[in-house]
Regions:
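C-terminal accessory "lid"/substrate-recognition subdomains
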Residues: 1-83, 122-125, 135-145
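Solvent-exposed beta-strand sheet faces enriched in polar/charged residues
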Residues: 7, 86-88, 117
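A generic structural signal for well-ordered alpha-helical surface patches
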Residues: 62, 66-69, 97, 101, ...
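Short leucine-rich amphipathic alpha-helical surface patches
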Residues: 68, 72-76, 89-93, 107
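Catalytic cysteine-centered active loop of the rhodanese-like fold, especially the PTP/DSP P-loop
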Residues: 81-104
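Post-Walker A helix-loop "phosphate-sensing" segment adjacent to the P-loop in P-loop NTPases
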Residues: 104-114
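Short beta-strand-centered segment that lines the nucleotide-binding/catalytic pocket of NTP-utilizing
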Residues: 112-123
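Nucleotide and nucleotide-moiety/phosphate-recognizing core
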Residues: 129
Length: 145
């Protein structure tokens, strides 16, 4: 049986070198820029609701789920002992955490038994989180444009 590990991480602290599949969640709107949500994490309901309200969220998660439901049986059939699926965002506290939790839940509902971890959740937040379109105040980029 293939062991399945789902994890979240912060791109600002480096990609996990042993991940088989890495998904970048930085396209989703960033709760960091919402003052009431900033101190919370992707484990908090308010953060999850904010992220799930992004217009790209539902379709993106459905496609990730479909891809994993296609690939995981193939990995198992090939005898792969361990598959690590990593979800990243800038700080590893909001988007990646919520999505990792959501995907793990969906995979459990589909009959898999993923182990779930959040590599950078307890790490102190980084200063200078990205401000790309839709992620910063008024949608400004890091250079204010």
């Amino acid at each position: 049986m293939t062991e399945l590990v789902i994890m979240s991480f912060a791109f600002s602290r480096g990609e996990p070198p042993d991940a088989n599949l890495v998904f970048d969640m930085r396209f989703l709107r960033n709760p960091h820029w919402q003052e009431p949500l900033r101190p919370l994490t992707g484990l908090d309901r308010a953060v999850g609701e904010y992220i799930a309200g992004d217009v790209a969220y539902a379709e993106a998660l459905s496609r990730v789920e479909a891809l994993l439901l296609t690939l995981l049986p193939l990995y198992q059939g090939d005898g792969k002992a361990l598959v690590r699926v990593a979800f990243g965002c800038t700080g590893g506290r909001h988007r990646s955490v919520h999505v990792a939790e959501e995907v793990a839940g969906r995979l459990r509902a589909a009959g898999f038994s993923p182990r779930l971890g959040h590599r950078d959740l307890a790490a102190p937040p980084h200063v200078g989180t990205e401000r790309s379109a839709g992620n910063g105040p008024e949608g400004l980029g890091a250079d204010g444009c």
